[in-house]
Amino acid sequence: MKTKMIKPAQPLRNLLKVSFFAVSTIALSGLGSLSVQADETCMSPYMAKIVGQEDFVYVWTLGMEGVGDEQDKLVTVDVNPKSASYGKVINTLSVGGRNEAHHSGFTDDRHYLWAGGLDTNKIFIFDVHTNPAKPKLTKVITDFVAKSGGVVGPHTTYALPGRMMITGLSNNKDHGGRTGLVEYTNEGEYVSTYWTPTDSNLQGAVKTGNYADGYGYDVRVLPRRNLMLTSSFTGWSNYMMDFGKMLNDQEAMKRFGNTVVQWDLHARKPKKVLDVPGAPLEIRCAWGANNNYCFTSTALTSKIWLIYEDKEGAWQAKAVADIGEPSKIPLPVDISISSDDKMLWVNTFMDGKTRGFDISDPFNPKQIYEEKIGAQVNMVSSSWDGKRLYYTSSLLANWDKKGTDNEQFFKLYHWDGKALKQQFAIDFIKEKLGRAHQMRFGAYSLYAANLPVQQSVLAKHP
Protein backbone atom coordinates (compact mmCIF):
# COMPACT_ATOMS: atom_id res chain seq x y z
CA MET A 1 0.00 0.00 0.00
CA LYS A 2 1.37 3.38 -1.01
CA THR A 3 1.18 6.26 1.41
CA LYS A 4 -0.07 9.50 -0.11
CA MET A 5 2.07 12.51 0.80
CA ILE A 6 0.02 15.47 1.96
CA LYS A 7 1.72 18.82 1.49
CA PRO A 8 1.45 20.83 4.73
CA ALA A 9 0.22 24.42 4.79
CA GLN A 10 2.88 27.11 4.27
CA PRO A 11 3.30 28.12 7.97
CA LEU A 12 3.68 24.46 8.92
CA ARG A 13 6.11 23.86 6.05
CA ASN A 14 8.23 26.76 7.30
CA LEU A 15 8.21 25.31 10.81
CA LEU A 16 9.14 21.87 9.51
CA LYS A 17 12.02 23.31 7.48
CA VAL A 18 13.41 25.13 10.50
CA SER A 19 13.00 22.03 12.67
CA PHE A 20 14.68 19.84 10.06
CA PHE A 21 17.74 22.03 9.85
CA ALA A 22 17.97 22.33 13.61
CA VAL A 23 17.78 18.55 14.05
CA SER A 24 20.20 17.96 11.17
CA THR A 25 22.72 20.34 12.66
CA ILE A 26 22.44 18.83 16.12
CA ALA A 27 22.94 15.38 14.61
CA LEU A 28 26.05 16.53 12.81
CA SER A 29 27.45 17.99 16.00
CA GLY A 30 27.43 14.55 17.57
CA LEU A 31 29.82 13.21 14.93
CA GLY A 32 32.69 15.23 16.29
CA SER A 33 34.49 15.57 12.95
CA LEU A 34 32.29 18.25 11.40
CA SER A 35 31.76 21.91 12.09
CA VAL A 36 28.31 22.75 13.33
CA GLN A 37 26.56 26.05 13.05
CA ALA A 38 27.94 28.98 14.96
CA ASP A 39 25.98 32.16 15.18
CA GLU A 40 26.52 35.82 15.74
CA THR A 41 24.92 36.51 19.10
CA CYS A 42 22.77 39.44 18.04
CA MET A 43 20.46 37.67 15.61
CA SER A 44 16.72 37.09 15.80
CA PRO A 45 15.52 34.62 18.47
CA TYR A 46 13.34 33.01 15.81
CA MET A 47 16.47 31.38 14.37
CA ALA A 48 18.07 28.37 16.10
CA LYS A 49 21.42 28.97 17.80
CA ILE A 50 23.90 26.08 17.95
CA VAL A 51 27.46 26.21 19.25
CA GLY A 52 30.26 25.55 16.77
CA GLN A 53 32.70 26.89 14.20
CA GLU A 54 31.28 29.08 11.45
CA ASP A 55 32.55 28.41 7.91
CA PHE A 56 31.99 31.80 6.32
CA VAL A 57 31.44 35.45 7.04
CA TYR A 58 29.42 37.41 4.51
CA VAL A 59 30.56 41.05 4.48
CA TRP A 60 28.15 43.58 2.94
CA THR A 61 30.59 46.05 1.44
CA LEU A 62 30.25 49.61 0.13
CA GLY A 63 31.70 50.38 -3.27
CA MET A 64 34.49 52.94 -3.16
CA GLU A 65 35.61 55.35 -5.86
CA GLY A 66 38.92 54.32 -7.39
CA VAL A 67 38.84 50.89 -5.74
CA GLY A 68 38.15 47.82 -7.88
CA ASP A 69 34.84 47.93 -9.74
CA GLU A 70 33.61 50.69 -7.36
CA GLN A 71 30.37 48.75 -6.75
CA ASP A 72 28.67 47.55 -3.58
CA LYS A 73 29.22 43.83 -3.15
CA LEU A 74 28.71 40.81 -0.93
CA VAL A 75 32.12 39.46 0.03
CA THR A 76 32.45 35.88 1.31
CA VAL A 77 35.40 35.13 3.59
CA ASP A 78 36.45 31.60 4.59
CA VAL A 79 36.86 31.57 8.38
CA ASN A 80 37.12 27.83 9.09
CA PRO A 81 40.70 27.18 10.31
CA LYS A 82 40.57 23.65 8.87
CA SER A 83 40.01 25.00 5.37
CA ALA A 84 42.81 25.47 2.82
CA SER A 85 41.42 28.94 2.06
CA TYR A 86 41.15 30.03 5.70
CA GLY A 87 41.39 33.79 6.10
CA LYS A 88 40.89 34.42 2.38
CA VAL A 89 38.18 36.01 0.28
CA ILE A 90 36.64 33.13 -1.68
CA ASN A 91 33.83 34.94 -3.49
CA THR A 92 32.59 38.41 -4.35
CA LEU A 93 29.26 39.36 -5.88
CA SER A 94 28.85 42.94 -7.09
CA VAL A 95 25.33 44.35 -7.31
CA GLY A 96 25.81 47.35 -9.60
CA GLY A 97 26.56 50.91 -8.52
CA ARG A 98 26.93 52.38 -5.06
CA ASN A 99 23.78 52.22 -2.95
CA GLU A 100 25.30 53.03 0.47
CA ALA A 101 25.41 49.35 1.40
CA HIS A 102 24.85 49.10 5.13
CA HIS A 103 23.10 46.31 7.06
CA SER A 104 21.94 42.79 6.23
CA GLY A 105 19.99 39.99 7.87
CA PHE A 106 18.79 36.43 7.26
CA THR A 107 15.24 35.21 6.83
CA ASP A 108 14.07 32.97 9.67
CA ASP A 109 14.86 29.81 7.70
CA ARG A 110 18.33 31.21 6.89
CA HIS A 111 17.90 30.53 3.21
CA TYR A 112 18.17 34.16 2.15
CA LEU A 113 20.21 37.19 3.17
CA TRP A 114 18.54 40.58 2.75
CA ALA A 115 20.91 43.54 2.35
CA GLY A 116 19.85 47.18 2.08
CA GLY A 117 21.16 50.36 0.49
CA LEU A 118 20.57 53.54 2.51
CA ASP A 119 20.82 55.89 -0.48
CA THR A 120 19.05 54.12 -3.36
CA ASN A 121 16.60 52.33 -1.02
CA LYS A 122 17.16 49.06 -2.85
CA ILE A 123 17.05 45.75 -1.01
CA PHE A 124 19.17 42.93 -2.43
CA ILE A 125 18.12 39.36 -1.63
CA PHE A 126 20.82 36.68 -1.82
CA ASP A 127 20.36 32.90 -1.87
CA VAL A 128 22.89 31.61 0.69
CA HIS A 129 21.61 28.05 1.06
CA THR A 130 22.02 26.54 -2.41
CA ASN A 131 25.79 27.04 -2.24
CA PRO A 132 26.83 28.74 1.02
CA ALA A 133 30.32 29.42 -0.34
CA LYS A 134 28.94 31.25 -3.36
CA PRO A 135 25.80 33.31 -2.66
CA LYS A 136 23.54 34.15 -5.59
CA LEU A 137 21.52 37.35 -6.08
CA THR A 138 17.92 36.26 -6.66
CA LYS A 139 15.84 39.42 -6.25
CA VAL A 140 16.15 43.19 -5.93
CA ILE A 141 13.37 45.21 -4.32
CA THR A 142 13.36 48.58 -6.08
CA ASP A 143 10.01 50.03 -4.96
CA PHE A 144 10.60 50.11 -1.19
CA VAL A 145 9.79 53.84 -0.86
CA ALA A 146 6.62 53.68 -2.96
CA LYS A 147 5.29 50.50 -1.34
CA SER A 148 5.99 51.70 2.20
CA GLY A 149 4.31 55.05 1.71
CA GLY A 150 7.46 57.13 1.90
CA VAL A 151 9.91 55.33 4.19
CA VAL A 152 13.53 55.96 3.15
CA GLY A 153 16.79 54.25 4.15
CA PRO A 154 16.15 50.51 4.77
CA HIS A 155 18.43 49.75 7.70
CA THR A 156 17.91 46.65 9.86
CA THR A 157 16.48 43.58 8.11
CA TYR A 158 15.20 41.42 10.95
CA ALA A 159 13.68 37.94 10.89
CA LEU A 160 10.20 37.22 12.21
CA PRO A 161 8.30 33.98 11.46
CA GLY A 162 7.90 34.00 7.69
CA ARG A 163 8.44 37.75 7.62
CA MET A 164 11.17 40.38 7.50
CA MET A 165 10.82 43.55 9.57
CA ILE A 166 12.80 46.44 8.13
CA THR A 167 13.56 49.67 9.96
CA GLY A 168 13.74 52.92 8.04
CA LEU A 169 15.99 55.89 8.82
CA SER A 170 14.18 58.63 6.94
CA ASN A 171 11.27 59.67 4.71
CA ASN A 172 10.79 61.04 1.20
CA LYS A 173 9.10 64.29 2.24
CA ASP A 174 11.83 66.18 4.11
CA HIS A 175 14.58 63.50 4.28
CA GLY A 176 14.70 64.05 8.04
CA GLY A 177 14.51 61.40 10.74
CA ARG A 178 10.74 60.80 10.80
CA THR A 179 10.29 57.21 9.65
CA GLY A 180 8.75 53.81 10.30
CA LEU A 181 8.96 50.03 10.20
CA VAL A 182 8.17 48.14 7.01
CA GLU A 183 7.10 44.49 6.98
CA TYR A 184 7.64 42.06 4.09
CA THR A 185 7.06 38.36 3.56
CA ASN A 186 10.12 36.14 3.18
CA GLU A 187 9.31 36.05 -0.54
CA GLY A 188 9.77 39.81 -0.80
CA GLU A 189 6.14 40.92 -0.90
CA TYR A 190 5.17 44.11 0.94
CA VAL A 191 2.85 43.64 3.94
CA SER A 192 2.50 46.88 5.91
CA THR A 193 4.11 50.05 7.26
CA TYR A 194 4.12 51.06 10.94
CA TRP A 195 5.06 54.70 11.49
CA THR A 196 7.04 55.57 14.60
CA PRO A 197 5.01 57.67 17.09
CA THR A 198 5.52 61.43 17.31
CA ASP A 199 4.25 64.24 19.51
CA SER A 200 1.60 65.04 16.91
CA ASN A 201 0.57 61.41 16.48
CA LEU A 202 1.37 59.12 19.40
CA GLN A 203 -0.91 56.39 17.98
CA GLY A 204 -1.98 55.43 21.48
CA ALA A 205 1.56 55.22 22.87
CA VAL A 206 2.47 56.80 26.20
CA LYS A 207 5.12 59.53 26.07
CA THR A 208 7.19 59.13 29.23
CA GLY A 209 9.65 62.03 28.91
CA ASN A 210 10.63 64.94 26.71
CA TYR A 211 10.74 63.26 23.33
CA ALA A 212 8.53 61.53 20.79
CA ASP A 213 10.60 62.25 17.69
CA GLY A 214 9.44 59.52 15.33
CA TYR A 215 13.01 58.52 14.43
CA GLY A 216 14.19 54.99 13.71
CA TYR A 217 17.30 52.83 13.49
CA ASP A 218 17.40 49.28 14.91
CA VAL A 219 14.77 46.71 15.94
CA ARG A 220 14.89 43.74 18.31
CA VAL A 221 12.25 41.50 19.90
CA LEU A 222 11.68 39.44 23.05
CA PRO A 223 8.79 37.17 21.99
CA ARG A 224 8.17 35.81 25.50
CA ARG A 225 7.37 39.37 26.64
CA ASN A 226 5.49 40.34 23.46
CA LEU A 227 8.11 43.07 23.13
CA MET A 228 9.52 44.85 20.13
CA LEU A 229 11.98 47.73 20.60
CA THR A 230 13.16 50.32 18.10
CA SER A 231 15.95 52.87 18.50
CA SER A 232 16.65 56.18 16.72
CA PHE A 233 19.44 57.74 14.67
CA THR A 234 19.17 60.41 11.97
CA GLY A 235 17.73 60.97 8.50
CA TRP A 236 19.04 60.92 4.94
CA SER A 237 19.95 64.63 5.02
CA ASN A 238 22.50 63.85 7.74
CA TYR A 239 23.78 60.36 6.99
CA MET A 240 24.57 61.28 3.38
CA MET A 241 26.34 64.52 4.41
CA ASP A 242 30.10 64.84 4.86
CA PHE A 243 30.87 64.07 8.51
CA GLY A 244 32.99 67.16 9.15
CA LYS A 245 30.44 69.42 7.51
CA MET A 246 27.64 67.93 9.59
CA LEU A 247 29.55 68.38 12.87
CA ASN A 248 29.87 72.09 12.09
CA ASP A 249 26.20 72.48 11.14
CA GLN A 250 24.23 73.40 14.27
CA GLU A 251 20.89 72.63 12.66
CA ALA A 252 22.08 69.25 11.42
CA MET A 253 23.29 68.33 14.91
CA LYS A 254 19.76 68.88 16.21
CA ARG A 255 18.46 66.22 13.84
CA PHE A 256 19.30 63.12 15.88
CA GLY A 257 16.96 60.74 17.66
CA ASN A 258 16.54 60.60 21.42
CA THR A 259 14.11 57.74 21.90
CA VAL A 260 13.58 54.02 22.21
CA VAL A 261 10.03 52.87 21.48
CA GLN A 262 8.33 49.88 23.09
CA TRP A 263 5.94 48.14 20.70
CA ASP A 264 3.37 45.38 21.07
CA LEU A 265 5.13 42.76 18.97
CA HIS A 266 2.05 40.82 17.91
CA ALA A 267 -0.24 43.79 17.28
CA ARG A 268 2.60 45.88 15.76
CA LYS A 269 1.44 48.91 17.76
CA PRO A 270 3.58 51.37 19.75
CA LYS A 271 2.95 51.31 23.50
CA LYS A 272 5.54 53.55 25.13
CA VAL A 273 8.16 56.14 24.10
CA LEU A 274 11.24 56.14 26.33
CA ASP A 275 13.75 59.00 26.53
CA VAL A 276 17.24 57.80 25.58
CA PRO A 277 18.98 61.04 24.57
CA GLY A 278 21.99 61.09 22.27
CA ALA A 279 21.14 58.80 19.32
CA PRO A 280 20.64 55.24 20.64
CA LEU A 281 21.89 52.86 17.97
CA GLU A 282 22.11 49.04 18.07
CA ILE A 283 19.82 47.17 20.47
CA ARG A 284 21.10 43.90 21.93
CA CYS A 285 18.82 41.78 24.11
CA ALA A 286 19.83 39.25 26.74
CA TRP A 287 19.44 35.54 25.95
CA GLY A 288 18.69 34.14 29.43
CA ALA A 289 15.11 32.89 29.80
CA ASN A 290 14.49 35.22 32.75
CA ASN A 291 16.70 38.09 31.62
CA ASN A 292 14.12 40.59 30.48
CA TYR A 293 16.39 43.41 29.40
CA CYS A 294 18.29 44.81 26.43
CA PHE A 295 21.19 47.20 25.95
CA THR A 296 21.80 50.09 23.60
CA SER A 297 24.51 52.73 23.36
CA THR A 298 24.19 56.41 22.54
CA ALA A 299 26.51 57.74 19.85
CA LEU A 300 26.51 61.39 20.90
CA THR A 301 26.62 61.01 24.69
CA SER A 302 28.77 57.84 24.93
CA LYS A 303 26.61 55.94 27.39
CA ILE A 304 25.36 52.38 27.76
CA TRP A 305 21.62 52.30 28.38
CA LEU A 306 19.65 49.44 29.90
CA ILE A 307 16.09 48.90 28.67
CA TYR A 308 14.50 46.66 31.27
CA GLU A 309 11.23 45.33 32.65
CA ASP A 310 10.65 46.49 36.22
CA LYS A 311 8.94 44.59 39.04
CA GLU A 312 5.55 45.93 37.97
CA GLY A 313 6.02 44.66 34.44
CA ALA A 314 6.64 48.10 32.94
CA TRP A 315 9.54 48.80 30.60
CA GLN A 316 12.02 51.49 31.61
CA ALA A 317 15.26 53.04 30.33
CA LYS A 318 18.28 53.81 32.48
CA ALA A 319 21.81 55.03 31.69
CA VAL A 320 24.11 52.54 33.41
CA ALA A 321 27.69 53.24 32.23
CA ASP A 322 29.95 55.65 30.39
CA ILE A 323 31.88 54.52 27.32
CA GLY A 324 35.44 55.85 27.36
CA GLU A 325 35.57 59.58 28.06
CA PRO A 326 32.25 61.02 26.84
CA SER A 327 33.68 64.55 26.71
CA LYS A 328 36.03 63.40 23.92
CA ILE A 329 33.09 61.97 21.92
CA PRO A 330 34.62 58.56 21.08
CA LEU A 331 31.43 57.88 19.05
CA PRO A 332 30.13 54.47 20.15
CA VAL A 333 28.87 52.48 17.19
CA ASP A 334 28.20 48.72 17.09
CA ILE A 335 27.78 46.55 20.19
CA SER A 336 27.63 42.77 20.65
CA ILE A 337 26.34 40.77 23.62
CA SER A 338 27.74 37.36 24.57
CA SER A 339 25.38 34.39 24.56
CA ASP A 340 25.80 33.91 28.32
CA ASP A 341 24.79 37.55 28.97
CA LYS A 342 28.06 38.27 30.76
CA MET A 343 29.94 40.43 28.23
CA LEU A 344 29.05 43.41 26.09
CA TRP A 345 31.51 44.47 23.42
CA VAL A 346 31.31 48.15 22.46
CA ASN A 347 33.14 49.69 19.49
CA THR A 348 34.05 53.38 19.31
CA PHE A 349 34.66 54.75 15.85
CA MET A 350 36.81 57.80 16.52
CA ASP A 351 39.54 56.10 18.56
CA GLY A 352 39.29 52.76 16.74
CA LYS A 353 38.84 50.78 19.96
CA THR A 354 36.74 47.91 21.17
CA ARG A 355 35.85 47.74 24.86
CA GLY A 356 34.68 44.73 26.82
CA PHE A 357 32.18 45.33 29.64
CA ASP A 358 31.27 42.82 32.32
CA ILE A 359 27.46 42.97 32.36
CA SER A 360 26.86 40.20 34.92
CA ASP A 361 25.04 42.94 36.82
CA PRO A 362 23.18 44.67 33.97
CA PHE A 363 22.55 47.73 36.14
CA ASN A 364 26.27 48.17 36.77
CA PRO A 365 28.42 47.34 33.71
CA LYS A 366 32.17 47.45 34.33
CA GLN A 367 34.78 47.88 31.62
CA ILE A 368 37.32 45.08 31.98
CA TYR A 369 39.19 45.27 28.69
CA GLU A 370 39.99 47.46 25.70
CA GLU A 371 41.94 47.00 22.48
CA LYS A 372 42.74 49.28 19.57
CA ILE A 373 41.51 47.55 16.42
CA GLY A 374 42.48 50.18 13.86
CA ALA A 375 42.40 53.86 12.95
CA GLN A 376 38.62 53.45 12.75
CA VAL A 377 36.33 50.57 13.64
CA ASN A 378 32.59 50.10 13.35
CA MET A 379 31.01 46.63 13.37
CA VAL A 380 31.67 43.75 15.76
CA SER A 381 30.28 40.21 15.60
CA SER A 382 30.80 37.57 18.28
CA SER A 383 30.65 33.82 17.72
CA TRP A 384 28.06 31.97 19.79
CA ASP A 385 30.74 30.36 21.97
CA GLY A 386 32.31 33.77 22.63
CA LYS A 387 35.76 32.70 21.43
CA ARG A 388 35.88 34.67 18.16
CA LEU A 389 35.25 38.34 17.49
CA TYR A 390 35.12 39.78 14.00
CA TYR A 391 35.58 43.47 13.20
CA THR A 392 35.02 45.72 10.19
CA SER A 393 35.88 49.34 9.61
CA SER A 394 33.33 51.39 7.68
CA LEU A 395 30.61 53.53 9.23
CA LEU A 396 29.17 55.44 6.25
CA ALA A 397 30.87 56.44 3.00
CA ASN A 398 30.73 60.14 3.88
CA TRP A 399 31.55 59.61 7.56
CA ASP A 400 34.62 57.40 7.24
CA LYS A 401 37.95 59.02 8.01
CA LYS A 402 40.12 60.56 5.30
CA GLY A 403 43.61 59.82 4.01
CA THR A 404 45.69 57.15 5.72
CA ASP A 405 43.17 56.88 8.58
CA ASN A 406 40.61 55.55 6.12
CA GLU A 407 41.56 51.95 6.83
CA GLN A 408 39.13 49.41 5.42
CA PHE A 409 39.49 45.93 6.88
CA PHE A 410 37.98 42.69 8.07
CA LYS A 411 39.73 41.21 11.11
CA LEU A 412 39.37 38.12 13.27
CA TYR A 413 40.44 38.03 16.91
CA HIS A 414 40.36 35.18 19.41
CA TRP A 415 39.19 35.92 22.95
CA ASP A 416 40.50 33.71 25.76
CA GLY A 417 38.72 35.56 28.55
CA LYS A 418 41.71 37.79 29.19
CA ALA A 419 42.92 39.26 25.90
CA LEU A 420 42.11 39.56 22.22
CA LYS A 421 44.65 38.00 19.85
CA GLN A 422 44.50 38.83 16.15
CA GLN A 423 44.34 35.79 13.86
CA PHE A 424 44.20 37.42 10.45
CA ALA A 425 43.29 40.66 8.69
CA ILE A 426 42.12 41.40 5.15
CA ASP A 427 42.84 44.84 3.70
CA PHE A 428 39.71 45.65 1.70
CA ILE A 429 41.41 48.45 -0.21
CA LYS A 430 44.44 46.37 -1.16
CA GLU A 431 42.09 43.58 -2.25
CA LYS A 432 40.11 46.14 -4.33
CA LEU A 433 36.86 45.44 -2.49
CA GLY A 434 35.75 48.71 -0.86
CA ARG A 435 34.43 49.70 2.56
CA ALA A 436 33.77 46.70 4.83
CA HIS A 437 30.54 46.99 6.84
CA GLN A 438 27.96 44.44 8.05
CA MET A 439 28.98 40.83 8.82
CA ARG A 440 26.77 37.74 8.87
CA PHE A 441 27.88 34.15 9.51
CA GLY A 442 27.36 31.12 7.28
CA ALA A 443 27.93 27.39 7.78
CA TYR A 444 27.61 24.25 5.68
CA SER A 445 25.99 22.51 8.63
CA LEU A 446 22.87 24.61 8.19
CA TYR A 447 22.26 22.84 4.91
CA ALA A 448 23.54 19.30 5.45
CA ALA A 449 22.77 18.20 1.91
CA ASN A 450 25.12 20.84 0.58
CA LEU A 451 28.27 19.81 2.41
CA PRO A 452 31.26 19.63 0.06
CA VAL A 453 32.41 16.10 -0.77
CA GLN A 454 35.50 16.24 1.43
CA GLN A 455 33.30 17.06 4.46
CA SER A 456 30.43 14.65 3.79
CA VAL A 457 29.22 12.47 6.64
CA LEU A 458 29.50 9.22 4.67
CA ALA A 459 33.06 9.97 3.60
CA LYS A 460 34.21 10.30 7.19
CA HIS A 461 31.95 7.65 8.75
CA PRO A 462 31.71 4.58 6.46
Question: What spans do the regions from the language model cover?
Answer:
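Short coil/turn segments that connect the beta-strands within blades of beta-propeller domains
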Residues: 53-55, 109-111, 161-163, 224-226, ...
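Loop/turn-rich, solvent-exposed surfaces of beta-rich toroidal or solenoidal domains
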Residues: 302, 326-406
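Asp-box/WD-like beta-propeller blade repeats and closely related beta-sheet repeat scaffolds
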Residues: 128-222
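Surface-exposed loop and turn segments in beta-propeller and other repeat-based domains
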Residues: 88-100, 138-150, 193-214, 270-279, ...
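Blade-loop segments of beta-propeller domains
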Residues: 86-156
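Beta-strand-rich domains and repeat architectures in extracellular enzymes and scaffolds
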Residues: 39-79, 86-118
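Beta-propeller domains
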Residues: 107, 209-354
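Short, conserved, GDST-rich strand-edge loop motifs in beta-rich repeat architectures
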Residues: 52-69, 167-178, 231-255, 392-410
